[in-house]
A protein has these predicted regions:
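Active-site-proximal helix-loop elements at catalytic-domain edges
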Residues: 39-40, 89
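A short, conserved structural fragment
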Residues: 40-47
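Nucleic-acid-binding surface
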Residues: 19-23, 50-199
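Short amphipathic alpha-helical interaction segments
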Residues: 26-39
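Residue-level preference for nonpolar/small residues embedded in alpha-helices
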Residues: 4, 16, 29-30, 71
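Short amphipathic alpha-helical interface segments
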Residues: 2-19
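Charged, low-complexity surface patches
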Residues: 13, 26-27, 67-68
Length: 199
């Protein structure tokens, strides 16, 4: 049985079980045994060079991070992971550096980002048993304002309300936000718009 990458389901399963061919060789102790194990369907192919031991042993976000290295979770998917919205998107929203190769998976919404801004607010998170890179809440607030046109009005308001709660509870680092915005064109204007909506 082969599960191709562009048809990976979006449901959550057990985590941290993605294996490369090299992992299988180490686990089976030889190339011959590894090939036999794959032939005997002990390991299921879920993408180019990626395997799992059981169809329920992987999550599609884990596969994405196994296959593409220089990516960051952003916008809709990040808002969901941070519990800032009460809904689930059908696609994962992933930021890559501009001019990166196109991610061809049907369940990825790829956002091309200027190299100048790409790593601002990037943080490593243990998520469902595997590590991902995701923008912190301060960087996401900047992206929310910069990309307001991407969102339906009710979705945008839901995220804004979550940020208002963070601000009221002193869980939003305004100094960090100001520091980030020094790197952005029209940073002062973005800050003014942010303060208008969250205060």
């Amino acid at each position: 049985m082969s599960v191709m990458f562009d048809k990976i389901p979006t449901q959550k399963y057990n985590y941290g079980m993605i294996l490369t061919y090299s992992d299988i060789v180490k686990k089976e102790t030889s190339v011959r045994k590894a090939r036999k194990a794959i032939f005997d369907k002990k390991y299921l192919k879920i993408g180019h060079g990626l395997y799992c031991q059981d169809i329920i042993d992987y999550d599609s976000l884990e596969v994405i991070f196994s296959r593409y290295k220089n990516i960051i979770v952003t916008l809709n998917t990040a808002f969901e992971i941070y519990d800032m919205v009460d809904r689930n998107s059908s696609k994962y929203t992933i930021a890559t550096v501009e001019w990166s190769r196109v991610i061809t998976s049907i369940n990825v919404d790829q956002i091309f980002t200027s190299k100048k801004y790409f790593n601002i607010g990037k943080t490593k998170m243990l998520y469902q048993g595997f590590y991902i890179y995701i923008y912190d809440k301060e960087r996401l607030l900047i992206e929310l304002i910069r990309n307001k046109h991407r969102f339906p009005y009710d979705y945008y308001k839901e995220v804004v309300n979550s940020y208002r709660k963070l601000f009221i509870n002193h869980e939003l680092d305004i100094n960090k936000l100001r520091k980030y915005l020094k790197h952005f064109t029209y940073g002062n204007s973005i800050l003014s718009r942010i303060m208008e909506v969250i205060v």
